[in-house]
């Protein structure tokens, strides 16, 4: 009985231990969506440059990610690779990279650093175009395996708070202010 209790105690200590993970940028998936005129959507992906996370008892404790904004890409079916609309796709990507929007030449990365976690919501500092605001990652799911972790969640932010806007007010009005991100990360123990 004493041996069984010692094993149970050891397992409880392991389960309660904090584990640090390095996020693998090659397997990370960060998708984005923006809505125009309330009906037309643009969506795509952006690559992760690096990331780290600390998990304790299956709960995210801390973490940060750096996003490579120069990798922003569109997955709109209207701009498929074999489509004749490649010029339109290039125009969209050029506009997203421009100073009006993400200004990737000046700000090649964006970051998110967790400041607190409550339940399945992580609050943190999002920095885009050199501007930092508090944002929330919701629907957070953390799954630990043998030396691995999987983290998913959603983040919606107001692009206006980061200066992501057309210079023309009339054009800017056709685009919803909310940009939605879906994040799927995996990492290995450090």
Tell where the protein language model's regions lie, with residue ranges.
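Low-complexity, acidic/polar, glycine-enriched regions of mature
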Residues: 1-190
